[in-house]
Swiss-Prot record:
This is Galactose-6-phosphate isomerase subunit LacA. Pathway: Carbohydrate metabolism; D-galactose 6-phosphate degradation; D-tagatose 6-phosphate from D-galactose 6-phosphate: step 1/1. Gene3D superfamilies: Sugar-phosphate isomerase, RpiB/LacA/LacB. Its EC number is 5.3.1.26. InterPro entries: LacA, RpiB_LacA_LacB, RpiB_LacA_LacB_sf. One of its GO terms (molecular function) is galactose-6-phosphate isomerase activity. The gene is lacA. It catalyses: aldehydo-D-galactose 6-phosphate = keto-D-tagatose 6-phosphate. HAMAP family: LacA (MF_01555). It comes from the Bacteria. Heteromultimeric protein consisting of LacA and LacB. Belongs to the LacAB/RpiB family. One of its GO terms (biological process) is lactose catabolic process via tagatose-6-phosphate. It holds the Pfam family LacAB_rpiB.
Length: 141
């Protein structure tokens, strides 16, 4: 499993905080950030890399998280969540089988961002009754 991470200019500093944290937790990181990318381009780059392997997960950071979330939901088969707390990050894996989260650097601080990332990457899909909704989401697009 790889954790694919990317950020636009507004999310660069926080992306480095999250990236360094996850590397210290021994996760394999793929950083697709390129200088000058806006949130649309970076979200598309993260999604493309996430979709290479079923186990891959993605994190996109910009100023508020809303823009990358909107982009991610336009990608067929991508289930994404905009999160600003640890519990939502964890639960979106368990109940929605989300493969990507977005967060805003102007909304969450360093420690919260690390906890959000930790909750997301450590979350496991519960399946069962949740699969009905996931199937519905996957048919969209």
């Amino acid at each position: 499993m790889s954790i694919v991470i990317g950020a636009d200019a507004a999310g660069l500093r926080l992306k480095e905080v999250v990236k360094n944290f996850l590397e210290k937790e021994n996760f394999h990181l793929v950083d697709v950030t390129a200088e000058g990318q806006d949130f649309v381009d970076v979200t598309l780059a993260v999604a493309a890399e996430v979709n290479k392997e079923e186990q891959n997960l993605g994190i996109v950071i910009d100023a508020y998280g809303a823009g990358p979330f909107m982009v991610a939901t336009k990608i067929k088969g991508m289930v994404a969540a905009e999160v600003s707390d640890e519990r939502s990050a964890y639960m979106t894996r368990g109940h929605n089988n989300s493969r990507m989260i977005t967060m805003g650097a102007q909304l969450v601080g360093d420690e919260l961002a690390k906890n959000i990332a930790k909750g997301f990457v450590n979350g496991k899909y519960d399946g069962g009754r949740h699969q009905i909704r996931v199937d519905m989401l996957n048919k969209m697009g």
